[in-house]
Structure formats: structure tokens, C-alpha cells
């Protein structure tokens, strides 16, 4: 029997695909008997510290007066080095190359012989937004080259990464996963709390509202739908929705839009929804889409990035920017509940078949053991 591992996971703590995936992965790894140590500047929103074998090490952002700006990379590297050495960690699994893989590289240099091996998972931003920027490109490339393994969450992102950076080793694709937790409220209870009647069609959108999520297009799709009077849009926002309030008023959607900010637990909202709507201009995977599929809700989205790999033929996909086509698909779901239900069930079946934790977590364990074994052979 293989021994349990000691794994350090570094991620951002906020609502967003990378942090949510990293937290879920660590939780699953701990349930499988591994010790998991999280590093971040705040406790990740979905991290349950009451579970056994899960530890959290908070990193204080540097505020030394000699620096013009607060520093995070160096305090993070020092904390990772301290814990990595004292706990004899086997792996640093970092989500995002900068600053996390850079901090991991520095930490391993501080530790020296016997340092943890570094596995870097790219979720998109390093490649699509920061990679083309000459201020970051060399640092990202350095961090990836000095990782013992690099993974991406989709084949689309793997191709983009290989085109953007000059890397020596193979990039492995390990998709995201989702573990369905039971809802604590019924569909009727949630809709009643939201002020939505059973006759209204509830569309859900979950994101951190970053510019790439194109919330402007999200609102315009709903505004363009002919069944707009019966559509309510629930936005589970990982950031302030205030910048978009003016557009809501401009489009006359004040009666259609409901916003819940910092909603970390989606299980209570998704059962009350009838469909999911996503309008990103760049999406390497689409974890929110996967969560929507797991609840058997039909999805309407743009055909970009890794989204087709997630949904297959179990969603309505359209070319980016085609608001009319997106609105027409939304109308079709409203007009045909049976077709909407059938599409949602196809999506659920696909999610359960390909993106369950039981399929994905062992792939990460295999990568960990491969890099450890490779080092020992060397």
C-alpha cells in the first residue's frame, strides 16, 4: 500500500474557479488519507478546517515601509519554506504560476536538499492574460520551467500555453471536477426567499465578475430575449455588482435581475434555477458551467476556450458575441420545459461521467507520485 503524502496547496482564497478547485482538491485528498496544508493570504471561502488532516497557514502581506508597494510573493515563499521544511512536505501544488509557482521556486531554493516537488496547475490567466504581457512573460516561463510538473484544466489551455511559452516538458491535462453536496433548502423555499413565482423562469449566472466574464453581454442577452418578462436572472457574484447597476437601468432590467454577492455555497441556489447563462469572452474551463450541469440545468454559453470540452453536445453554444442567438436559445428553453429538462439531464449525465472527483483526484495523485519517483530515480 502506498504511503499517504504531505501536500502543500497554494491558491487564491476568493470566489473563482482556481481557488474553488484547489480547495475541493485538497478536501478530497485529505479524505483519501493525505495531509493537506493550504497557503494563502486569507482562508479560502469553501475551506472547512473542521475536517481531519486539513491545515491552513495564513500569509501576512508584507507592509515594510522600505517598499513602495505591499509584497506577497516573498512572505508567501518564506511561509511555504518554513512549513515545507518543518512538516517535511512531499509536494507544493500551486494554482497559478505567478505569484504562486514563483514563490514555490524560491521556497525550494531556501529548503535545498529534500525540498518538496512543485506541481503547477494553470487555470487560464497566466497564459491568456499575463503571458502576452512582457512584464510577466519571462517570470511565468521561468516558474513553469522550474516546476516538476505542469498541468492545465483543458486541452484548449494546454495548446495556448505551449504556443505562448517555450517549455521543455510535456503539459498534462487534468480537468476540473465538482462534488455535489446536498442542498439545505428546497427549490420552493429558495424561490420564495428570492421573490420568484413558480411561473417565472430563473436563469443563474455564477462568476467573479471579472472583465472576461462579460457581464455586459450577459445583461444584453436577457434584455434581447422575447420572453424577457417571464425571465429572472440570478447573479451569484464573487465581487461587487455596483459597476453594472447603470447598465441594468439602461436596459430596463431592474425587475429581472437579482444579485447575491459573495455567495460561497451554490448548492442552495442551483436547485431553484431553470437554466444557466454564461457569456465569457475567454474561459479555459468554466467551473461554474460544470456546477450548473451537475444540478441538471441546461446551459447557454459562447463556444470559446475549454467550454466545448466541458459540455460536449449537452448545451446550447454560440459564436462569441452573437447576442441574438443566445437570446433565442434562452427563449427556446422557456418555451419548451420538456426540451430544457432533457438537455439538463444530458448535461448532468456528462458531468457525472467525466468530471466526478472519483475520476479526477486520482490523476493528481498519480502526478504527485510520478514526480517524487522521478526525483528518487535521478
Briefly describe each language-model feature range:
Residues 43-44, 178, 206, 210, ...:
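Glycosyltransferase donor-sugar binding loop
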Residues 183-196:
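A short helix/loop element that forms part of the nucleotide-sugar donor recognition site in Leloir-type
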Residues 158-178:
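Helix-loop-beta element that forms the nucleotide-linked donor phosphate-binding surface
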Residues 281:
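Aromatic "clamp/platform" in nucleotide-sugar-dependent glycosyltransferases that forms part
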Residues 298-301:
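Short hydrophobic beta-strand element within catalytic cores of glycosyltransferases
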Amino acid at each position: 500500500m502506498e504511503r499517504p503524502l504531505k501536500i502543500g496547496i497554494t491558491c487564491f482564497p476568493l470566489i473563482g474557479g482556481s481557488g474553488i478547485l484547489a480547495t475541493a482538491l485538497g478536501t478530497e485528498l485529505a479524505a483519501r488519507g493525505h495531509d493537506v496544508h493550504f497557503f494563502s493570504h486569507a482562508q479560502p471561502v469553501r475551506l472547512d478546517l473542521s475536517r481531519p488532516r486539513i491545515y491552513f497557514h495564513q500569509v501576512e502581506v508584507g507592509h515594510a515601509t522600505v517598499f513602495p508597494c505591499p509584497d506577497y510573493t516573498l512572505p508567501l515563499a518564506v511561509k511555504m519554506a518554513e512549513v515545507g521544511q518543518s512538516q517535511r512536505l512531499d509536494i507544493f501544488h500551486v494554482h497559478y504560476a505567478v505569484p504562486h509557482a514563483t514563490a514555490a521556486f524560491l521556497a525550494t531554493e531556501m529548503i535545498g536538499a529534500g525540498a518538496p516537488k512543485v506541481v503547477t496547475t494553470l487555470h487560464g490567466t497566466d497564459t491568456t492574460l499575463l503571458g502576452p504581457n512582457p512584464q510577466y512573460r519571462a517570470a511565468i516561463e521561468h516558474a513553469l520551467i522550474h516546476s516538476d510538473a505542469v498541468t492545465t484544466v483543458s486541452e484548449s489551455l494546454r495548446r495556448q500555453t505551449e504556443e505562448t511559452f517555450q517549455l521543455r516538458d510535456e503539459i498534462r491535462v487534468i480537468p476540473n471536477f465538482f462534488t455535489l453536496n446536498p442542498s439545505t433548502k428546497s427549490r420552493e423555499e429558495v424561490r420564495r426567499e428570492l421573490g420568484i413565482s413558480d411561473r417565472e423562469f430563473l436563469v443563474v449566472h455564477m462568476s467573479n465578475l471579472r472583465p472576461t466574464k462579460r457581464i455586459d453581454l450577459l445583461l444584453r442577452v436577457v434584455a434581447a430575449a422575447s420572453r424577457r418578462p417571464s425571465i429572472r436572472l440570478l447573479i451569484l457574484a464573487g465581487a461587487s455588482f455596483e459597476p453594472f447597476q447603470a447598465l441594468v437601468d439602461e436596459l430596463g432590467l431592474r425587475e429581472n435581475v437579482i444579485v447575491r454577492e459573495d455567495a460561497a455555497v451554490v448548492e442552495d441556489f442551483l436547485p431553484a434555477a431553470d437554466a444557466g447563462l454564461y457569456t465569457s469572452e475567454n474561459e479555459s474551463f468554466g467551473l461554474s458551467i460544470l456546477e450548473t450541469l451537475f444540478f441538471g440545468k441546461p446551459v447557454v454559453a459562447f463556444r470559446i476556450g475549454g467550454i466545448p470540452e466541458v459540455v460536449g453536445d449537452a448545451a446550447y453554444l454560440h459564436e462569441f458575441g452573437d447576442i441574438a442567438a443566445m437570446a433565442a436559445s434562452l427563449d427556446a428553453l422557456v418555451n419548451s420545459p420538456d426540451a430544457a429538462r432533457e438537455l439538463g439531464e444530458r448535461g448532468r449525465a456528462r458531468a457525472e461521467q467525466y468530471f466526478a472527483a472519483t475520476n479526477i483526484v486520482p490523476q493528481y495523485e498519480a502526478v504527485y507520485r510520478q514526480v517524487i519517483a522521478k526525483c528518487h530515480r535521478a
